[in-house]
Design a protein with these regions (language model features):
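Hydrophobic alpha-helical transmembrane segments
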Residues: 1, 7, 17-20, 28-30, ...
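C-terminal accessory domains and tails appended to enzymatic cores
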Residues: 4, 181, 194, 199-267
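Short glycine-enriched loops at secondary-structure junctions
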Residues: 9-15, 62, 104-110, 160-161
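Glycine-rich nucleotide/cofactor/substrate-binding loop typically near the N-terminus or early
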Residues: 17-19, 42-96
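Short catalytic helix/loop segments, enriched in acidic residues and glycine
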Residues: 22-47
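N-terminal glycine-rich phosphate/adenylate-binding segment common to multiple enzyme folds
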Residues: 81-124
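Active-site glycine-rich loop that binds ribose-phosphate moieties when present
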Residues: 123-149, 157-161
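Active-site rim beta-loop-alpha module in soluble metabolic enzymes
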Residues: 145-206
Length: 267
């Protein structure tokens, strides 16, 4: 039977106009406006999925995972809110029944200069993450987790840096770069233009064949941490090793295991 639903993982830092940390944190200046645009961009992806005859399931993947306005998404869209203490993290809920994964509002990885909000998972604890020697983003980890379930990653929107990195990791993936980032500034597309482009490009992506990305049998994880205390805590795990004063490593054998170790390190 043909698969009839798409999984849409939504973050906030890669949404158009979002530039400063305060705009991503509940109760801070600009947060509510950011959430409305986050919802609008997710809704644009949903419309493309629904118009193609599929169901859309949205996973709120930012901070508390309680940012999206469900009533502003198209009727029929199901929304996952909050955290389930699951190694899927921003992809918790995806399984082999999905036809593909879509990523909205994604951002450059920690350790890069691709965005003033560049980070991987928790910027207060983690400086950067590498997998098998290459700088890894949240998209890297999430698309690997989707691949473990047999699900291809078909589309991503966010800053220009993450779109370039995603295209390198998953050839053929559809992209919409909503902003260019220069130092602590962002050069943004108009919010309504962004939504139009996301809907149009997601529709195109659904008509393409994108292969499930390859998952290496061993995933050598290197995590650069922001404090000596974070390093000491990580080393309480018997299989985590120290590389230098601020970096620890772990050899995982699946994306699920890799995500679980990262959750442990963040604490």
């Amino acid at each position: 039977m043909e698969k009839k639903k798409y999984f849409i993982s939504v973050d906030l830092e890669g949404v158009t106009d979002v530039t400063a940390w305060c705009e991503t944190e509940k109760g801070q200046d600009g947060y509510e406006r950011s959430c409305l645009q986050m919802t609008s961009e997710a809704a644009a992806a949903c419309r493309a999925v629904l118009e193609a005859g599929y169901d859309a399931v949205v996973r709120d993947g930012h901070d508390s995972a309680r940012n999206l306005r469900h009533e502003l998404l198209p009727r029929g869209v199901k929304l996952m809110r909050g955290w389930a203490c699951h190694p899927g993290s921003m992809m918790a809920g995806i399984d082999g029944s999905y036809a593909g994964a879509i990523y909205i509002g994604y951002h450059a990885p920690g350790g890069s200069n691709g965005s003033p909000l560049a980070h991987t998972m928790n910027y207060k604890v983690i400086r950067s993450v590498k997998i098998n020697g290459k700088l890894a983003s949240e998209f890297t980890m999430n698309s690997l987790y989707a691949a473990e379930q047999g699900v291809p990653s078909v589309f991503i929107s966010g800053d220009a840096s993450i779109c370039r990195l995603a295209a390198e990791e998953v050839p053929g993936i559809g992209t919409v770069a909503v902003k260019e980032c220069r130092g602590n500034s962002t050069f943004n597309m108009h919010p309504e233009d962004v939504c139009d482009m996301i809907q149009e490009e997601v529709a195109k992506a659904l008509r393409k064949e994108v292969a499930v990305r390859r998952v290496d049998p061993e995933l050598e994880l290197e995590v650069s941490l922001t404090s000596h205390q974070a390093v000491r805590k990580a080393l309480m795990h018997p299989l985590i090793r120290q590389i230098d004063d601020s970096t620890v490593c772990y050899r995982a054998h699946s994306p699920r295991e890799l995500n679980a170790i990262l959750d442990y390190i963040i604490g």
